[in-house]
Amino acid sequence: MQEEKSKEDHSRLINVTAKDLTVRNRRLVEVPYTATLSHAMNTLVANSISALPVAAPPGHWIGAGGSMIMESDKQTGVVRKHYIGILTMLDILAHIAGEDSNLSDLDRKMSSQVSSIIGHCLEGLSLWTLNPNTSVLECMEVFSKGIHRALVPVESSIESNNTIAGVELIESASAYKMLTQMDLLRFLKDHHFDDLKTVLSRSISDLGAVNDSVYAITERTTVSNAINVMKGALLNAVPIVHAPDIAQEDHLQLVNGRHRKVIGTFSATDLKGCRLPELQTWLPLTALEFTEKTSGKEREVVSCGVESTMEEAIEKVVTRGVHRVWVMDQQGLLQGVVSLTDIIRSLRSTLS
């Protein structure tokens, strides 16, 4: 009986496509390769997003990862733009807080062109498209590999008989929408939780969703140091832990967060509401001081227990708009982390 129910769930979900997942999403927000970092940051803030595709004239650039993702005229098919990479908030922050961390030079750094920093963080080189007819299960497969977002053509110019549903590096379309890991989980929460009752009632530990390797910064790590170590470790967010027992130099690097008390979270997206004059004064602060200043109070840490259900984990990431949940034991000490990638990977493996 359970096996039949599983098959029924699978068949319902397989009829959902990437096009369905993006139906309510707005048209693509992007910046030209000549845009300044200041302009790009303002665009990120104005649209409440953490990443932007970067567009350039065709024929002059190699796309991220060798991709050839083009925007073409709907009537003539003439290529107008080539998307050459993704710019993230972490790219901008890492550029500001790099080795040359003379904060008085912030205006000069923010006047740099976005094309000069694409790829400084690895995520900027990850540029993919998903065919609109790709099933939600195939989308989950892609996102379970750590790909955070993909472009979905509104109308593809690639010949339909050559088009295969799935992830692509070559595409031409008159317009695109962005599909993210969060979009997929929000869609499942809003429309398909009933189909997934069995798996959602299982614990995150039972499903193997908890990653027990969790790096952290301490209450004495500055914003500037935090950004640099996050860039090096390809992390968009880290827990801030209480660590009075460690050596002074360890406050400058990532530490093992397990079995420590979490007192905050520092995320690259926390800085997207900062104006440039504020950035200049906030980079030398500790990350903990910064998070308290930006929110006006001590922020609640988004966490769950080791035995929390998958449904509870998804509810937390979607309703709170975060990309990971810290996993605590009964004493409130850090045991691990569950990211959007972990959630999607666990769900996908149960629907095989």
UniProtKB/Swiss-Prot annotation:
Expressed highly in rosette leaves, cauline leaves, open flowers, developing siliques and dry seeds, but at a low level in stems and floral buds. It holds the Pfam family CBS. One of its GO terms (biological process) is developmental process involved in reproduction. Disruption phenotype: Shorter siliques and reduced seed sets in pv42a and pv42b RNAi double mutant. Residues 24-106, 122-196, 210-281, 297-352 form the CBS domain. Keywords: CBS domain, Repeat. InterPro entries: AMPK_gamma/SDS23_families, CBS_dom, CBS_dom_sf. Belongs to the 5'-AMP-activated protein kinase gamma subunit family. Plays redundant role with PV42b in regulating male gametogenesis and pollen tube guidance. This is SNF1-related protein kinase regulatory subunit gamma-like PV42a.
